[in-house]
């Protein structure tokens, strides 16, 4: 068994593309090996900013020989049919055999194909993988037809300790002919730009740029380490995290946890060397979030915190150089660059506070929210109306505070700081509002009205924040539904799925008793008759359609959210599909009670009985060609089990309605559980298909009534399992 080592050395690959690229390359080469019939012991992929590396263990030195038999047409088939069979295999008539079969004599082809040496097959597999690898962005160079994310410098391809034979044509020959894979580089047309497979690589761009040969993966990894390259991404990540933490701990500090930044920096360096620098004290009065964001987004520095979580005037930079002798110069250079960056941030901070936040609201009129939905100022007007409607319905909400927060919520979008750092929207509004003397509840709502932005984000709980956050998200959903800009498939350019999940969390986590139809209807009405007319939605029917469609959309997002929390989606569907239920708190309470009921022995058995009853009714309806309708006639009951079941159903209906009205869902389920005994007894002792037609029809009506009674709690036909 032999080993294949493949390395593609290029200019720097963007960090965000690296992991996907090595995964795709591994998959493409693996597929090529399988198609070529080459078994192996596994593929391992490695990626650095400049190289994609793949090692395949346990390869055979040659493909297996192939023995294959193909049955063709009958021996006396027309010549045209036989010729077609021969043409498909590339054989002649004398190479076929005639064999007797139970269906008569048939022609057979016996194909013997000797396996090719693996060293001949691998270059073709590699070429196909390279040309099939898709990058989000790619480029050509020289006279290139071949594309790669960045100019490709070399291809190391070593099998059994020797370089594979072959090359990739990077463009066209002097005659203008396109060039692809070349099995023999020496035979390539003169002047053809080639990238030949070889057995050499290079180390760190600056610390070890000279080429050196390698024999196998062990030699490759060891020599690259000597050449200041760690090819294992996880090792580089671990080195960065551990050494940065050690630097901070040596000062009694800690590195601010930032997994995304750690991932990005891992893709920027081949030889990570964390170093600690200082932030000029003159910038420490700027909000910590601004400093952290500037260091993170512009410089890729880790922030450093004190033991209490406050920002310290230190940072960690990860150098791509072995800075043993020059670490002081590296740190000083980074501190100098950071001072320039933070000077800009401090300028915005000082300038933005010279005018009150309220004075910036009118400037929102110059910002387009959406071409069909008006400006950001138009959105603020709608959000104020929606928030006022909610303030009258959210417990503890102060209408004046809610209105003020809604008015100022988007004002920081016009500031220099948010223009430079859009991710600080809302947060800067809070700082500026507090500076202006706005009430803390208003400032908090300005910050929180974008939340929650993801499943891990905290959900606002303060009444003022909840009103503004909910009004903002509902307005967004209503507006984009109004202009038919809905999510399709995997595309959701306006983050409407996230907005819907935000609506769900705000309502459910704050136990808000808000009928969705009323909430959505109020939001749609804020667009005004003129806007509705422009969108062709002026009539009430169209508005109702939007409400219905939006509720269905929110219901789907609710299923996704609850499924991720371990709740069965079919139970949500069973409750939601009854129609008329748009109170999410009540709906989930009923779903929870239904889940508990179905987990019990009574629930499991009653569900089976329900299915048995509905199946019998459906089968008999099909036989009769008409639906079972009407209530059973008590006078036709002949057995005690019929009477007991009918009485149990009457009792159930009498108990369920008051329980549901009181939102005592557990009591409703207990009432349902008491139906099990009469149902089991009925099926044990009563023959539904009685000889007398009237008796049979009456018993079918009684069975149908089981489904009708249970449907007052949920649509049990939607329940799976």
From Swiss-Prot:
Its EC number is 6.1.1.14. The keyword Protein biosynthesis applies. It is an enzyme of class 6 (ligase). NCBIfam families: glyS. PANTHER family: GLYCINE--TRNA LIGASE, CHLOROPLASTIC_MITOCHONDRIAL 2 (PTHR30075:SF2), GLYCYL-TRNA SYNTHETASE (PTHR30075). Tetramer of two alpha and two beta subunits. This is Glycine--tRNA ligase beta subunit. It comes from Rhodospirillum rubrum (strain ATCC 11170 / ATH 1.1.1 / DSM 467 / LMG 4362 / NCIMB 8255 / S1).
């Amino acid at each position: 068994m032999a080993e294949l080592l493949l390395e593609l050395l290029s200019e720097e690959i963007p960090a965000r593309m690296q992991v996907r690229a090595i995964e795709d390359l591994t998959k493409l080469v693996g597929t090529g090996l399988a198609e070529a019939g080459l078994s192996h012991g596994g593929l391992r992929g490695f990626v650095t900013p400049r190289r994609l590396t793949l090692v395949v263990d346990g390869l055979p030195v040659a493909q297996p020989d192939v023995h294959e038999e193909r049955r063709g047409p009958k021996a006396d088939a027309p010549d045209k049919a036989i010729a077609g069979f021969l043409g498909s295999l590339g054989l002649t008539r004398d190479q076929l055999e005639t064999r007797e079969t139970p269906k008569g004599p048939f022609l057979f082809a016996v194909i013997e194909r000797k396996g090719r040496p693996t060293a001949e097959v691998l270059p073709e597999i590699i070429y196909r993988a390279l040309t099939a690898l898709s990058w989000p962005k790619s480029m050509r160079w020289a006279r290139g037809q071949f594309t790669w994310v960045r100019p490709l410098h070399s291809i190391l391809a070593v099998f059994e300790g020797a370089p594979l034979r072959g090359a990739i044509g990077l463009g066209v020959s002097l005659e203008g002919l396109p060039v692809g894979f070349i099995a023999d580089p020496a035979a390539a047309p003169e002047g053809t730009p080639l990238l030949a497979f070889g057995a050499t690589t290079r180390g760190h761009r600056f610390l070890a740029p000279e080429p050196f040969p390698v024999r196998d993966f062990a030699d490759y990894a060891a020599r690259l380490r000597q050449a200041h390259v760690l090819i294992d991404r996880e090792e580089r990540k671990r080195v960065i995290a551990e050494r940065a933490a050690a630097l901070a701990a040596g000062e009694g500090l800690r590195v601010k946890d930032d997994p995304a930044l750690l991932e990005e920096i891992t893709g920027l360096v081949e030889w990570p060397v964390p170093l600690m620098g200082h932030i000029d004290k003159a910038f420490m009065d700027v909000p910590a979030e601004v400093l952290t964001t500037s260091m993170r987004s512009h410089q890729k520095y880790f922030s450093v915190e004190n033991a209490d979580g406050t920002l310290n005037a230190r940072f960690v930079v990860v150098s791509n150089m072995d800075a043993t002798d020059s670490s002081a110069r590296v740190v000083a250079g980074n501190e100098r660059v950071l001072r320039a960056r933070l000077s800009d941030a401090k300028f915005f901070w000082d300038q933005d506070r010279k005018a009150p936040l309220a004075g910036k609201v009118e400037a929102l009129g110059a910002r387009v929210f959406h071409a069909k939905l008006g400006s950001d100022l138009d959105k603020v007007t709608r959000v104020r109306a929606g928030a006022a409607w909610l303030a009258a319905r959210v417990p503890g909400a102060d209408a004046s505070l809610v209105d003020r927060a809604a008015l100022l919520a988007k004002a920081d979008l016009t500031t220099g700081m948010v223009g430079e750092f859009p991710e600080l929207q809302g947060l800067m509004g809070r700082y500026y509002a507090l500076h202006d003397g706005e009430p803390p509840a208003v400032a908090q709502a300005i910050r929180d009205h974008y939340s929650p932005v993801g499943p891990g984000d905290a959900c606002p709980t303060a009444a003022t924040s909840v009103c503004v956050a909910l009004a903002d998200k509902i307005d967004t959903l209503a507006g984009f539904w109004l202009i038919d800009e809905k999510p399709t498939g995997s595309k959701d350019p306006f983050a409407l799925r996230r907005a819907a999940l935000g609506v769900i969390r705000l309502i459910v986590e704050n136990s808000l008793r808000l009928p969705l139809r009323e909430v959505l209807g109020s939001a749609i009405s804020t667009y005004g008759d003129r806007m509705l007319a422009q969108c062709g939605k002026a009539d009430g029917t169209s508005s109702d359609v939007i409400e219905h469609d939006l509720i269905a959309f929110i219901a789907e997002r609710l299923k996704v959210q609850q499924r991720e929390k371990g709740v069965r989606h079919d139970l949500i569907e069973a409750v939601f599909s009854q129609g008329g239920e748009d109170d999410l708190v009540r709906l989930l309470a009923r779903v929870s009670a239904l889940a508990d009921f179905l987990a019990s022995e009574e629930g499991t058995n009653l569900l089976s009985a329900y299915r048995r009853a509905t199946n019998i009714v459906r089968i008999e309806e099909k036989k009769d060609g008409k639906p079972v309708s009407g209530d059973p006639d008590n006078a036709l009951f002949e057995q005690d089990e019929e009477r007991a079941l009918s009485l149990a159903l009457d009792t159930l209906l009498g108990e369920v309605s008051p329980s549901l009205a009181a939102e005592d869902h557990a009591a409703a389920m207990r009432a349902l559980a008491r139906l099990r005994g009469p149902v089991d007894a009925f099926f044990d002792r009563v023959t539904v298909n009685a000889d007398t037609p009237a008796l049979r029809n009456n018993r079918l009506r009684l069975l149908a009534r089981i489904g009708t009674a249970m449907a007052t709690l949920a649509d049990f036909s939607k329940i799976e399992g």
